[in-house]
Amino acid sequence: SDAIEVTIPSFEGEMGILKDHIPLITFLRPGIISIKNQDEKNFFAEEGTVEFSNNNLLILSSTVKDLKNFDKNSISGALKDAEKKLQETNLSDKEQYITSYKINSLKEISQ
């Protein structure tokens, strides 16, 4: 069935997309994608691209995990990897920014 609303984490902030939303292309930052229809499904996504046009939503991301299948050990491992990456001295500002968002999102999920 069609989604009533999809909320995505974009670099502009949390963005809610409803039917007949204006066309858009934006960049996805690490965070929670929420899809609402009769129930609600939540996914953790890493960076990517979002396009909405003619009531079709396309999300391209290297990693998307269903939160109901994302166990504490997986979250903990991903969090440790991200924190370790943030300690690297050769990261670009963009990589630091994205990794920080990833860490914050993973901490939010783990609670």
Go through the PLM ranges and name each one.
Residues 1-81:
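Compact, glycine-rich, soluble single-domain proteins
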Residues 65-111:
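Acidic/glycine-rich phosphate/pyrophosphate-binding loops and surrounding catalytic core
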